[in-house]
Amino acid sequence: MTLASAYLSPTAAGDLTEFATQYPASGEHWDKVDDDPFVAHDFDATYVGDVSSGSNKEDLYNLGSLPVGVGAISYIRVYCIVKANNSSITRTANISIKTGGTIYYGTSFYPNSAYNTETETWTTNPQTGLAWTIAEVNALQAGMRINGSVIIPVLTWSVTQIYVLVVFTLLEGLVGTVWQETTKLHWIDENGAEQSKEG
């Protein structure tokens, strides 16, 4: 059994677009957090965000699809690169996913004043309790919720990157890490050389 991985970045808006801020102001929220997982995120060059006051605020994003060659899915892990204008042990946020029409939340986390990587792992689909299927992952939405708070001072949150790592069993004939770049499938062969073809 050979384990492989794919990274899925936002490709379109999901079912919630509640954050009040995006920078730059042009374009869409999803294209502010779609930095290539193989390249360092762009910090404050592009981001979305909101403040931790009043009601909860949440953005969800549709993601790219899995490449060919995916067998059994071991787990998904959502990555969120986030900061607030001050550190806090009272204001929180959650990584979120939407599957089968229902939103599920990861463990609450506190912000740092510098960009920090938050992660949440789901080994099974929380709706079914079973291993993820290809169709479920391809329909997945991922994002983040800022939890409302009446505590002063108000925190301003910024999110610069969100993506999903999918770890799976590689189908026979493909060895090593597999990933998608536009419409092209890349993989590492048994000699350690990168190969590619249209997916």
Each language-model region and where it sits:
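Disulfide-rich extracellular domains of secreted proteins
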Residues: 1-172
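Viral virion structural and adsorption modules
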Residues: 172-199
